[in-house]
Amino acid sequence: MGLLDGNPANETSLVLLLFADFSSMLGCMAVLIGFWRLKLLRNHVTKVIACFCATSFCKDFPSTILTLTNTAVNGGFPCYLYAIVITYGSFACWLWTLCLAISIYMLIVKREPEPERFEKYYYLLCWGLPLISTIVMLAKNTVQFVGNWCWIGVSFTGYRFGLFYGPFLFIWAISAVLVGLTSRYTYVVIHNGVSDNKEKHLTYQFKLINYIIVFLVCWVFAVVNRIVNGLNMFPPALNILHTYLSVSHGFWASVTFIYNNPLMWRYFGAKILTVFTFFGYFTDVQKKLEKNKNNNNPSPYSSSRGTSGKTMGGHPTGDDVQCSSDMEQCSLERHPNMVNNQQNLNNNYGLQQNYNDEGSSSSSLSSSDEEKQTVEMQNIQISTSTNGQGNN
């Protein structure tokens, strides 16, 4: 059987499948190259994102080869391999998305000083747990060719949801709760007067939740389609949405990661526009991006008002937590007695600490006794960049 069988619906689905696979691989590769080239981006959160992209790429590459060679249609080892790649790879990507939500929550809300200590558990969870579903799928002999790929057969609806879509809904629900708690925390901080740039904080809030929105949108049609398939209905439009969006999750997640990080889109913007400068186009824009590609957004610490330790209605005030308008920066100011216990923390993974005396603070203390005291603060930056020194 050839790659195209003459059925318009199947051919459309196949073309979208290949397009989604290739775009997903390119997107993930771009993010990995960005993390490799830009040392400023090397922190705990970006390590989690890199693991997601690496997992997605390793899922999409063999899937693309199997689709192009059309060997899975005859069953046997290629068909089983295709089913393994889909089940294990997709499950692992979901879990890395959950770990990203956990990391951001721990850094912003819980102010975890050493988030990298959880990484070994992330590896075990994300690359170990999917083995269970994969082994059960193979042991129960549920694998069949189901259209454009091999997976759990149509007659095994219970296994489809028990081994795959049930865990997806559970993982997404936990991720959504963590993102909601993080967004609520930053919302309270912002509305307690944390910044003079409140009009930009809508963008900040969006960057905190957009990756989980992408996660849901890319897989919700797959869930709906499998429910409909369980009712012995196979609408072509729903199948096409399922095929493209679920397979292209890596691409849209990569677009989100690049959008959330000014360093990365400046870097790629400068590289892309270099081609056009040979023809005299976008010269000024390219020079501006090239000049600023290693510039992070200004640290919120630069507009610090000092520490007060006050709370408002049980919530942190603007003096306790300061968030910039971009997701990649959020500084949390702590009291001296909290900072003294953490002066030896490792700064390599997005934990940048600045201990300044009163003379370098942006706010001055009124009484002479207060002027003699040292105000110590800690800046913690989260997400996809650090505001430190580094080389391209």
Swiss-Prot record:
Result when mutating residue 148 to G: Reduces the affinity for cAMP by 100 to 1000-fold
InterPro entries documented for this protein: GCR1-cAMP_receptor, GPCR_2-like_7TM, GPCR_cAMP
Glycosylated residue positions: 10
Topological type in the membrane: Multi-pass membrane protein
Compositionally biased tracts (Polar residues): 298-310, 375-392
Localization per Swiss-Prot or TrEMBL: Membrane
Consequence when changing residue 302 to G: Greatly reduces ligand induced phosphorylation
PTM sites of type Phosphoserine: 299, 302-304, 308, 360-364, 366-368
Extracellular side: 1-13, 69-83, 140-162, 225-235
Stretches with biased composition (Low complexity): 340-367
Cytoplasmic side: 34-47, 110-120, 182-205, 261-392
Record carries keyword Phosphoprotein: yes
UniProt PTM comment: C-terminal Ser or Thr residues may be phosphorylated.
Impact after mutating residue 104 to N: In DN4; constitutive phosphorylation and greatly increased affinity for cAMP. In DN1; Constitutive phosphorylation and greatly increased affinity for cAMP
Coiled coil (UniProt feature): none
Disulfides per UniProt: none
Any one GO biological process: oscillatory cAMP signaling
Outcome when changing residue 308 to A: Greatly reduces ligand induced phosphorylation
Record note on what altering residue 157 to D does: Reduces the affinity for cAMP by 100 to 1000-fold
A Pfam cross-reference name: Dicty_CAR
Family, similarity comment: Belongs to the G-protein coupled receptor 5 family.
UniProt function note: Receptor for cAMP. Coordinates the aggregation of individual cells into a multicellular organism and regulates the expression of a large number of developmentally regulated genes. The activity of this receptor is mediated by G proteins.
Name this protein carries in UniProt: Cyclic AMP receptor 1
Natural source organism: Dictyostelium discoideum
